[in-house]
Swiss-Prot record:
Putative oxidoreductase. Substrate binds at residue 175. The lineage of its organism: Eukaryota, Metazoa, Chordata, Craniata, Vertebrata. Belongs to the short-chain dehydrogenases/reductases (SDR) family. It comes from Homo sapiens (Human). Keywords: NAD, NADP, Oxidoreductase. One of its GO terms (molecular function) is oxidoreductase activity. NAD(+) binds at residues 50, 52, 201, 205, 234. Its EC number is 1.1.-.-. The active site is at residue 201. The keyword RNA-binding does not apply. Pfam families: adh_short. This is Dehydrogenase/reductase SDR family member 12. SUPFAM superfamilies: NAD(P)-binding Rossmann-fold domains (SSF51735). InterPro entries: NAD(P)-bd_dom_sf, SDR_fam, SDR_member_12.
Length: 317
């Protein structure tokens, strides 16, 4: 990451990604965009047991949607499901325990889900940031396994289910941190470079943006989007970035503020009217590059990413 890119991004973050940035942006929101009732619509939210995923799942439930929570750990997931049911009065909240860094588990879940359920909206919210290089049981670098390969398998596996329904959507929670990274397909699992968990996470988030753009091109019947929730005060941030949280805690967005654009992309007709494949921040499509610091990738590089992911995905099927 260049010094220029780092400085520009950090200044942008302080201006736009904080609580005050949200409070400024929301002045332009259309209030009735989220005044919708959605009985019969089916949503799948990964990482829906805490943070902005849980906040999004709760708001969907309050509006009558059926919600499938895909979570890793049984006990906190059960607690979250119970809380969502109590607060929303909606019983149509279902729980699936899946480790999204385990491709074999994801494939098994996808095959079972396809047989038993319909789906209108997939929300790839779950994320992983480990700060020391760890390998999964399958020998995959953990951040890459959960943030990139896991998202790839889950999304491509569920595309046939989504394509059967009216107004299908896929929302992937990326991060503004991806602005400091250019797509790098030469070391996807951090085998040849010093490991920096924050930068690996940012690279994964760049990969998600590229995948979203490519899926939008290949599957025009589905509305794809990626988004940045801003800097939100969530359990994940507190655990993965304790220093950052300690420094900026009082300036961070609430979980509801961080979830707002995710919810807007999932529910509003205004979001569906936007071109597919875009990257959103505070209900607006924004550039995927910093000014004077483009991180664009070639079609060949993007195709290489997809080829590697597809080969890995099939290995574990």
């Amino acid at each position: 990451m260049s010094l220029y890119r780092s400085v520009v991004w950090f200044a942008k973050g302080l201006r736009e990604y904080t609580k005050s940035g949200y409070e400024s942006a929301c002045k332009d929101f259309v209030p009735h965009d989220l005044e919708v009732q959605i009985p019969g619509r089916v949503f799948l939210v990964t990482g829906g047991n805490s943070g902005i995923g849980k906040a999004t799942a709760l708001e969907i439930a309050k509006r009558g949607g059926t919600v499938h929570l895909v979570c890793r750990d049984q006990a906190p997931a059960e607690d979250a499901r119970g809380e969502i049911i109590r607060e929303s009065g909606n019983q149509n909240i279902f729980l699936h325990i899946v480790d999204l860094s385990d491709p074999k588990q994801i494939w098994k879940f996808v095959e079972n889900f396809k047989q038993e359920h319909k789906l209108h909206v997939l929300i790839n919210n779950a994320g992983c940031m480990v700060n020391k290089r760890e390998l999964t049981e399958d020998g995959l670098e953990k951040n890459f396994a959960a943030n990139t390969l896991g998202v790839y398998i889950l999304t491509t596996g569920l595309i046939p289910v989504l394509e059967k329904e009216h107004d299908p959507r896929v929302i992937t929670v990326s991060s503004g941190g991806m602005l400091v990274q250019k797509l790098n397909t030469n070391d996807l699992q951090s085998e040849r470079t010093p490991f920096d968990g924050t930068m690996v996470y940012a690279q994964n988030k760049r990969q998600q943006v590229v995948l979203t753009e490519r899926w939008a091109q290949g599957h025009p019947a589905i509305h794809f989007s990626s988004m940045h929730p801003g800097w939100a005060d969530t359990p994940g941030v507190r655990q993965a970035m304790p220093g950052f949280h300690a420094r900026f805690g009082d300036r961070l967005r609430s979980e509801a503020q961080g979830a707002d654009t995710m919810l807007w992309l999932a529910l509003s007709s205004a979001a569906a009217a936007q071109p597919s494949g875009r990257f959103f921040q505070d209900r607006k499509p924004v550039s995927t590059h910093l000014p004077l610091a483009t991180a664009s990738s070639s079609p060949a590089e993007e195709e290489k990413l997809i080829e590697i992911l597809e080969q890995l995905a099939q290995t574990f099927k």
